[in-house]
Amino acid sequence: MTRYKAIISYDGSGFYGYQVQPNTRTVQAEIEKALTKMHKGKTVRITASGRTDTGVHAKGQVIHFDSELDITAEKFQKALQVMTPFDISFLTVEEVPDDFHARFGTVGKEYRYVVKRTKIFDPFSRNFALHYPYELDISKMKLASKRLIGEHDFTSFCSARTERDSKVRTLYSIDFYEEDDETLVIAFQGNGFLYNMVRILTGTLLDAGQGRISPDDISEALLARDRQKLISKTAPPQGLYLWRVDYE
């Protein structure tokens, strides 16, 4: 039995999230279907670094799986690329030690959120970015983001449905990239993220960019540890990308 690590990307528009769910199309289900077919009907399960919600994309999701097939990692990559749908891509496949774990071995992740700042709605980017036709002061967003850097209890910045007992996470950095006059990318790097955390942080920073909330409001929300204390909405899923997963 050999363990394989794969880095995959996918367009989340056509999936009901990553995780297998009854009677729905998911990323995990499509990949496991292909692997099971390769193994002549024997079920093969995959493990990912984490789940993504409906409409959320991935540029660098990491999975692992075990196989008894006597084929190279390169052939696995080519076969899976052919046998999975066009909205999933296998960027790399490699053999790894048996103790490698895609989920529990992570030491950090990067998510990016894409904002289209056009006055007129662009139908071609509707599934891949948030349309935000309002004025933004990027300098205010940067000031607000500094209050979020470091180790904090992010209870106020995650969904009430978060299953984790501890809401303490460390944000290493929040960077802002103005790719052109119309596109703003916000990059979040941290040791881990809670359910809806990046989308809530994005909504908060957009409000800061409009002057609706101040850096002090963010500090107070962190201390309150109560999602109801935060006025900012959760940004929609289509602008969010799991960009990179780091391991030791």
Swiss-Prot record:
Substrate binds at residue 111. It catalyses: uridine(38/39/40) in tRNA = pseudouridine(38/39/40) in tRNA. Formation of pseudouridine at positions 38, 39 and 40 in the anticodon stem and loop of transfer RNAs. This is tRNA pseudouridine synthase A. The active site is at residue 53. Homodimer. One of its GO terms (molecular function) is RNA binding. HAMAP family: TruA. Belongs to the tRNA pseudouridine synthase TruA family. PANTHER family: PSEUDOURIDYLATE SYNTHASE, TRNA PSEUDOURIDINE SYNTHASE-LIKE 1. GO terms for biological process: tRNA pseudouridine synthesis. The keyword Transmembrane helix does not apply. Keywords: Isomerase, tRNA processing. The gene is truA. Its EC number is 5.4.99.12. It is an enzyme of class 5 (isomerase). Transmembrane segments: none annotated.
